[in-house]
Amino acid sequence: MPKLAVVLLVLLILPLSYFDAAGGQAAEGDRRGNGLARYLQRGGRDNEAECQINTPGSSWGKCCLTRMCGPMCCARSGCTCVYHWRRGHGCSCPG
């Protein structure tokens, strides 16, 4: 089988939701909420965890250990999410 055919076969098998171009971490959850969010709640570790499900009814989503801003995760704690006209959401971090 030629290499191109193998690559195309692999891309068809692996859903694109496994890959996150925004730099966040894709995490598996369930229909009641996100598994990573519940894990972080144990022991008071959920202070800054924010999660969102990619599509309604999906068990896949993205979780940030910092602030979630639009489709991205901010690089550090203490950042705020701002909206720039024509550029979309972005993180504004102190210092």
From Swiss-Prot:
Subcellular location: Secreted
Cysteine disulfide links: C64-C73, C69-C81, C74-C91, C79-C93
GO molecular function: acetylcholine receptor inhibitor activity; ion channel regulator activity; toxin activity
Superkingdom of origin organism: Eukaryota
Pro-piece positions: 25-45
Major location category of this protein: secreted
GO cellular component: extracellular region; host cell postsynaptic membrane
UniProt entry keywords in alphabetical sequence: Acetylcholine receptor inhibiting toxin, Disulfide bond, Gamma-carboxyglutamic acid, Hydroxylation, Ion channel impairing toxin, Neurotoxin, Postsynaptic neurotoxin, Secreted, Signal, Toxin
Statement: the UniProt record of this protein carries the keyword Secreted: yes
Residues with the 4-hydroxyproline modification: P56
The keyword Secreted appears for this protein: yes
Positions of modified residues (4-carboxyglutamate): E50
Tissues with expression: Expressed by the venom duct.
Signal peptide (from-to): 1-24
Notes concerning its domains: The cysteine framework is XX (C-CC-C-CC-C-C-C-C).
Protein function: Alpha-conotoxins act on postsynaptic membranes, they bind to the nicotinic acetylcholine receptors (nAChR) and thus inhibit them. Through its two C-terminal domains, this homodimeric protein would bind to two nAChR allosteric sites, located outside the nAChR C-loop of the principal binding face and at the adjacent binding interface in a clockwise direction. This toxin specifically blocks mammalian neuronal nAChR of the alpha-7/CHRNA7, alpha-3-beta-2/CHRNA3-CHRNB2 and alpha-4-beta-2/CHRNA4-CHRNB2 subtypes.
Record's subunit section: Hetero-, homo- or pseudo-homodimer (identical sequence, different post-translational modifications). Heterodimer of [carboxy'Glu-49', hydroxy'Pro-55']Ms20.3 and [carboxyGlu-50, hydroxyPro-56]Ms20.5 may exist.
Family, per entry: Belongs to the conotoxin D superfamily.
Protein name (Swiss-Prot/TrEMBL): Alpha-conotoxin-like Ms20.5
Species: Conus mustelinus
